């Protein structure tokens, strides 16, 4: 696989210089009050969790499709996508975030960094990942008159470690080395980001601590073993719901306490600026390759993009390249759990309200008092009560569509795709695959659908075996 410009480099999507922390910490919000979910208290005696709001003075202006790409694709200098995003963090972290932002901009034009990243993505990660025509899945959705859409799978499951997560982990590990940080922390839900982070830490000789909810550790025991085998310390989190939200909170506590020596490799397009922008740009290789491969295969663009959405990194990696191609539909699929009316789901964009969690304003699952509602999904990677702020922005602007799939529907897709294509999907990916059952009957003949096959399902086989009779 040849390294190409599409698969080996990233470029920062914001051209303006980062704002100083003094500018970022004293702004008052002009918007009506939103629900604020505070972070848990720090264990550091010297640190306090104050709220730093970075919302600008003017509310966002609604944008028409096809408008200025800078408005569609870039956060502003405060790290906002419309009213979403920002930096709601303790003062302790402001310098670290500003330092990270400055380094990100600098490395975007650093040829040595780009060459090193390109080499690792090609030779270690195994990019570029194939755009695979799913012949039997396509046949499954063919109607009686012989018409139907054409299904292509962007095979991120074939990356080293078995998911898209390695794209971001490699790049952030290289960035941490440039910052002189030798201690790495990360949160994980399904374990794929934890495995990817442990992998790159082993590769670069960095200390690695992974925070993981105790409930997730039980259902993802294989990935826990893999992380420990790779030399990572996996710390179980028993507070709250003992899932991804709580693991993220614990990782932030650690970062506040050890900010001078530690880099936090956040695994999704969530959290305070610059993480949503930075993680998106490190995953944008997915969409760049897809554009190139589509041109090679059929001489055009995809008609429809489909990806699962928890925090939203794999979806944003695919979507970002096509945001300004307004004829390309972008569809995100959330976890409906036991059903949207059951109260046991993780459909943040479908059922959530605007609030603040883990350093950013976005849609959240919360009650009338602003307290987080416990999410549920059979998929540990989608079991999160928030979502990346850019997804919230796309929802409000109408640029992307968001739907939800139940546990039962995802399990059926898990089995169906395994038997039709000989590829065992992750439970996260199975949610996107399940949505094809609803989408494909509505599509015209020859519509080209690209689905981001975000991860393989080895990690989920034990969980699925409890539910499926095979």
From Swiss-Prot:
Residues 1-24 are annotated as: Disordered. Belongs to the TrpB family. Tetramer of two alpha and two beta chains. Pathway: Amino-acid biosynthesis; L-tryptophan biosynthesis; L-tryptophan from chorismate: step 5/5. It is found in: Plastid, Chloroplast. Residues 12-22 have a biased composition (Low complexity). This is Tryptophan synthase beta chain 1, chloroplastic. GO terms for biological process: indoleacetic acid biosynthetic process; response to oxidative stress. The gene is TSB1. The beta subunit is responsible for the synthesis of L-tryptophan from indole and L-serine. The modification N6-(pyridoxal phosphate)lysine is found at residue 165.
């Amino acid at each position: 696989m040849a390294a190409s410009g599409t698969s080996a480099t990233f470029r920062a999507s914001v051209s303006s210089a980062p704002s100083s922390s003094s500018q970022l910490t004293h702004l008052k919000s002009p918007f009506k009050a939103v629900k604020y979910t505070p972070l848990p208290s720090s264990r550091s005696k010297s640190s306090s969790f104050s709220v730093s709001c970075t919302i600008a003075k003017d509310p966002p202006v609604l944008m028409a499709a096809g408008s200025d790409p800078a408005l569609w694709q870039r956060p502003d200098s405060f790290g906002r996508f419309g009213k979403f995003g920002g930096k709601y963090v303790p003062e302790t972290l402001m310098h670290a975030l500003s330092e990270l932002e400055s380094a990100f901009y600098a490395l975007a034009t650093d040829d040595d960094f780009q060459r090193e990243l390109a080499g690792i993505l090609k030779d270690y990660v195994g990019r570029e990942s194939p755009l695979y025509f799913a012949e039997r899945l396509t046949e499954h959705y063919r109607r009686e008159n012989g018409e139907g859409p054409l299904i292509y799978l962007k095979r991120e499951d074939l990356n080293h470690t078995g998911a898209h997560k390695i794209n971001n982990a490699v790049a952030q590990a290289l960035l941490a080395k440039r910052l002189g940080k030798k201690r790495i922390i990360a949160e994980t839900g399904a374990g794929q980001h934890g495995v990817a982070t442990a992998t790159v830490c082993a590769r670069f000789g960095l200390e690695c601590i992974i925070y993981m909810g105790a409930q997730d550790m039980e259902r993802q025991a294989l990935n826990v073993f893999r992380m420990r085998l790779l030399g990572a310390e996996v710390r179980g989190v028993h507070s709250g719901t003992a899932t991804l939200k709580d693991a993220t909170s614990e990782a932030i506590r650690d970062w506040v306490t050890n900010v001078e020596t530690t880099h936090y490799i956040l695994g999704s397009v969530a959290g305070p600026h610059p993480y949503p922008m930075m993680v998106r740009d490190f995953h944008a290789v997915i969409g760049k390759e897809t554009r190139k491969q589509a041109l090679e295969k059929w001489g055009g663009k995809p008609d429809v993009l489909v990806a699962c959405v928890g925090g939203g990194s794999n979806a944003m990696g695919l979507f970002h390249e096509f945001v300004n191609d307004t004829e390309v539909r972008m569809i995100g699929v959330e976890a409906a759990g036991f059903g949207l009316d059951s109260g046991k789901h993780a459909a943040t964009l479908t059922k959530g309200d605007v609030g603040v969690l883990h350093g950013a304003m976005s849609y959240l699952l919360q009650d009338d008092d602003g307290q987080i509602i416990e999410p549920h999904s059979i998929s540990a990677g989608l079991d999160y009560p928030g979502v990346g702020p850019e997804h919230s922005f796309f929802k409000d602007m109408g640029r992307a569509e968001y739907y939800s799939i139940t546990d039962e529907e995802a399990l059926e897709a898990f089995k169906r795709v395994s038997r039709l294509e000989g590829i065992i999907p992750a439970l996260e990916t199975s949610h996107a695959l399940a949505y094809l059952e609803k989408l494909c009957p509505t599509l015209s003949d020859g519509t080209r659908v690209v689905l981001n096959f975000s991860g393989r399902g080895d990690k989920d086989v034990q969980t699925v075996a409890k539910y499926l009779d095979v």
